[in-house]
């Protein structure tokens, strides 16, 4: 039973990863989020890794600072299977987007892409990425 105390709960890990995702989407540092909450960046790290649980009132504060509803942190949570959530294709697609935006490259690509205002340039960039992906698949 001692092992369970040292192993983070999957829900805590998920909530932490969603905090990290939203924080990085906003370009906010752990230090800045910690300052806004009156805690250290180390505590933010522990929340994001799921090693420390985020209390309800703290999660409410985090949601206000990151400008998302509290429910955002529980979207696609483990054990949240089924009947009332989005369809399987939607959940799969949602997880793919979360994984993409959780990576450093994905976040950089997203930030750069949204700065491109010309729709023709955006379309050409999407076509280029699709061509590169198709080439990589055929190898």
UniProtKB/Swiss-Prot annotation:
<feature type="DNA-binding region" description="H-T-H motif">
    <location>
        <begin position="30"/>
        <end position="49"/>
    </location>
</feature>
<dbReference type="InterPro" id="IPR010982">
    <property type="entry name" value="Lambda_DNA-bd_dom_sf"/>
</dbReference>
<dbReference type="InterPro" id="IPR001387">
    <property type="entry name" value="Cro/C1-type_HTH"/>
</dbReference>
<keyword id="KW-0238">DNA-binding</keyword>
<dbReference type="GO" id="GO:0003677">
    <property type="term" value="F:DNA binding"/>
</dbReference>
<feature type="domain" description="HTH cro/C1-type">
    <location>
        <begin position="19"/>
        <end position="73"/>
    </location>
</feature>
<keyword id="KW-0804">Transcription</keyword>
<keyword id="KW-0805">Transcription regulation</keyword>
<protein>
    <recommendedName>
        <fullName>Uncharacterized HTH-type transcriptional regulator R00410</fullName>
    </recommendedName>
</protein>
<dbReference type="Pfam" id="PF01381">
    <property type="entry name" value="HTH_3"/>
</dbReference>
């Amino acid at each position: 039973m001692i092992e369970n105390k040292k192993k983070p709960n999957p829900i805590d890990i998920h909530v932490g990863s969603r905090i990290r995702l939203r924080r990085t989407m906003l370009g906010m540092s752990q230090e800045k989020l910690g300052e806004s909450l009156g805690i250290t960046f180390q505590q933010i790290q522990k929340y994001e890794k799921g090693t420390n649980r985020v209390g309800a009132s703290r999660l409410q504060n985090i949601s206000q600072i990151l400008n998302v509803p509290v429910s955002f942190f529980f979207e696609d949570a483990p054990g949240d299977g089924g009947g009332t959530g989005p369809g399987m294709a939607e959940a799969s697609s949602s997880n793919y987007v979360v994984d993409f935006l959780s990576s450093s490259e994905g976040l950089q690509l997203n930030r750069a892409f949204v700065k491109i205002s010309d729709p023709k340039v955006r379309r050409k960039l999407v076509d280029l990425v699709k061509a590169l992906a198709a080439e990589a698949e055929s190898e």
